[in-house]
Amino acid sequence: MFSVTRRRAAGAAAAMATATGTLYWMTSQGDRPLVHNDPSYMVQFPTAAPPQVSRRDLLDRLAKTHQFDVLIIGGGATGTGCALDAATRGLNVALVEKGDFASGTSSKSTKMIHGGVRYLEKAFWEFSKAQLDLVIEALNERKHLINTAPHLCTVLPILIPIYSTWQVPYIYMGCKFYDFFAGSQNLKKSYLLSKSATVEKAPMLTTDNLKASLVYHDGSFNDSRLNATLAITAVENGATVLNYVEVQKLIKDPTSGKVIGAEARDVETNELVRINAKCVVNATGPYSDAILQMDRNPSGLPDSPLNDNSKIKSTFNQIAVMDPKMVIPSIGVHIVLPSFYCPKDMGLLDVRTSDGRVMFFLPWQGKVLAGTTDIPLKQVPENPMPTEADIQDILKELQHYIEFPVKREDVLSAWAGVRPLVRDPRTIPADGKKGSATQGVVRSHFLFTSDNGLITIAGGKWTTYRQMAEETVDKVVEVGGFHNLKPCHTRDIKLAGAEEWTQNYVALLAQNYHLSSKMSNYLVQNYGTRSSIICEFFKESMENKLPLSLADKENNVIYSSEENNLVNFDTFRYPFTIGELKYSMQYEYCRTPLDFLLRRTRFAFLDAKEALNAVHATVKVMGDEFNWSEKKRQWELEKTVNFIKTFGV
C-alpha cells in the first residue's frame, strides 16, 4: 500500500514538474519577437530576372558564332529539354523554332504528368514488355518533373467511378500495381471509396448502378508555360535559343554528305543566317518527316515548298507533311468546360468509352479539361482544328457519367493537337503500306541517327521529355566525339521560377505586395518565385494592373481601395493583366498576341470568347512596345482573331 501511494505521489510530482515547465516555456515566449519578424522567415523577392539576353543579341550570336557544338531544330518540349541538358553539360548550343515555343503539340496535351494506367492494362493483357517499360519510365520521370518545376506541377487525385461489381477488384488491383511499379517515386497510395463516399466527393456523377470508385494519383501541369520555362532556363545557362527562326535547308559537307548545319530565316525580319554545327538534332515532333526529307535530299532542301506565311490564310489547317514516313499522325481533341463538371481538386477517368479509349475530365486552371479523341490521319496538318463531331463525341462520353444535362453551350474552348506517334522509317515495307490505326501503337520515343549524321528524336510524351533529352544528348556526345563534359544533371536542376520556391510562397507574395489570394495564387502557380517581378510592374503604373479584357475600354475604374491594396481582381473573371503581358515581352520572348493569349497565359484555351475581348488591348500594348506599324498591328489583330475563332466558339 505504501509503495503504491509513493508511486502515485511520484507520478503527481512528475506531472506537476511537466506542467510547470510547460507554463514557463509558454510565458517565456512573450519576450521573443513574433515569428514574422524572425529573419529566418524573411524572403527576398526578386525584382528583376537574371540578366536576359535580348532577341537581337541572340540573333547576332547565332549569325556570328563560327560553329556550335550542336544545333537543335524544334522548340517544343523535347527540343528545349535537349537545349537545357546540352548547355548544362558544357556544350555550345543553338536552338531554332519556326514558330513560338510550344506552338505545336507541346501546348495541346492533356496537361497530365502520368505513367499511363491504360498502358499498364495493355502491358498485362498483351504481355507487352514495351508497354510496361513505357509505364515504369514515365512513373520515374513523373516525380523528377514535379520536383524541378513545383510551381507548374501538382499532384492530382483521379477518381474512377465503377459501375460493375466485377470491376471493383479488377480496377483496385490495377491501381495497386500502378503504385507498385512507381516504387519510391510513388506520389500517394491509391484507395477505394464506397458508393456513398464517391457521391460525396463527386455529386455530379450519375448514381445509376454505381458500385464504388477507385482513387489513384498522377500529376497535372501547365504544358506551354513549362515549355517556355525550359527555353528561358536554357538561355540562362548559356544556350542560344530563338523562336520564329525557320530552317529552310540543311547544310551538307560537299565531300561526305554529312549534315553540318542549316540555313535559316528570321521570320520577323526575313534575315537569312547560316548556322554551322558539329551535330544537328531534329526535334520537331510530328513534323520530323519534313526535316528528314531535307536529310534525304542531297541538296538539303525540302521535298515541297515551305508554306507561304506572308499573308493571312483563309484556313489554318494547312498540310505540313504530305507523306510522313516516321510519324504516324493522329489527332487528339480536347474541350474546356465550367468547373462544375468535375470535383474541384479531383479528376475523373472514364474507362468505358464506346470505342475502347479512356477519357479524362480534369480540373485545370479553374476549369474542367475533357478529352481526348484519337483520330488517325494520313497527312500531318500544320494547325489542326477540332470539328463539331469531335466536340460532340467528348460531350457524349461525358454524359454517360454526369447527372445533369451536358450542354454544347457550356464548351468554353476546343482545340486539336497532333500526336507524334512514331515508327522506324527504315522498316517501312517496299510497297509503302504503313497502316493507319494508332490505338495499338506504343506511345514511346524513338531515337536514331541517319546515314548523314542527323540525329532525330520523336515520339514520347511530356512526362518523359527529360529522359528523351538525356538520351539525345548522350547520342550527341557520342556522334560529336565530345570529351571532358559534365554529366547530365537535369534531374536536379530547378527551372526558372522554382528557385527558393516553398509551398507558402502564395501567402508570402500576397502579404508583401498586398495581393488578393486569387491573384497571388494565379501568379505563383504560373511564374513561381519570379511572380514578384510582375508585381513590380504593377507598382510602376495603374495601367499595368488592368486586366487585358478591360484595358481598351474607355474611362476604366480599376478599383476603389486603400493605396497599399495593390491588386485585387476577385471581381474580374480572369487575372491576365497588362503587367503580365509586359513581363512576358521583356523576360519570356513573347513576340505576338497569340504567344501571350495562348501560351504564356492560357486565356484562349480557357475561354476563347472572353479571350477575343482581350485581343485589341494585347495588340495595342505589344504594338507600342515593339513599335509596330499600323499595317503590322492590323495584320496581327486579324491573325489573332481568326485563329482564336478556330477554338470551337
Swiss-Prot record:
User: What's a single GO BP term from this record?
Assistant: glycerol metabolic process
Q: In which pathway does it act?
A: Polyol metabolism; glycerol degradation via glycerol kinase pathway; glycerone phosphate from sn-glycerol 3-phosphate (anaerobic route): step 1/1
Q: Which UniProt keywords are given for this protein, alphabetically ordered?
A: FAD, Flavoprotein, Membrane, Mitochondrion, Mitochondrion inner membrane, Oxidoreductase, Transit peptide
Catalyzed chemical reaction(s): a quinone + sn-glycerol 3-phosphate = dihydroxyacetone phosphate + a quinol
Q: Name one GO cellular component term.
A: mitochondrial intermembrane space
Chief place of localization: mitochondrion
Q: Would you identify the family this protein belongs to, as annotated?
A: Belongs to the FAD-dependent glycerol-3-phosphate dehydrogenase family.
Q: What is this protein called?
A: Glycerol-3-phosphate dehydrogenase, mitochondrial
What's the source species for this entry?
Saccharomyces cerevisiae (strain ATCC 204508 / S288c) (Baker's yeast)
Designated gene of the protein: GUT2
